[in-house]
């Protein structure tokens, strides 16, 4: 990994992730109505992770632009939670998306183990 870059509040202007970006979110808990979204993590696969620490205003136009860009595929594992949290707290419809958990369930029908650790272990070794 080349590094981790922490951004407070929003991504900097002009940051380009290319045609695909991996996305993960962190929240204060798992309750969509109660627990605030606190962090969005993004990586284009170049070895750098961009962490956006959000405040409760969710005033992050650059981050929202990336997450709603129709020309950028957003890659998630268990997208249902992340997409719902972003809709609830940021007010955006994140699209287009690809969920590796759903892909695993469709392609790996011989198992019921579709967590990120199990999928990564089998695919990446």
Language-model segments: which ranges?
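Nucleic-acid-contacting surfaces of polymerase cores and analogous helical-repeat interfaces
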Residues: 125
């Amino acid at each position: 990994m080349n590094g981790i870059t922490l951004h407070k509040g929003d991504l900097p202007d002009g940051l380009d992730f290319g045609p695909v970006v991996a996305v993960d979110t962190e929240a204060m808990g798992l309750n969509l109505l109660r627990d605030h979204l606190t962090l969005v993590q993004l990586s284009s696969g170049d070895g750098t992770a961009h962490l956006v620490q959000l405040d409760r205003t969710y005033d992050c136009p650059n981050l929202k632009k990336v997450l709603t860009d129709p020309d950028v595929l957003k890659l998630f594992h268990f997208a249902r939670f992340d997409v719902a949290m972003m809709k609830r707290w940021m007010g955006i419809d994140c699209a287009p998306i690809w969920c590796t958990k759903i892909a695993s369930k469709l392609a790996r029908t011989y198992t019921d183990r579709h967590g990120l650790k199990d999928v990564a272990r089998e695919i990446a070794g």
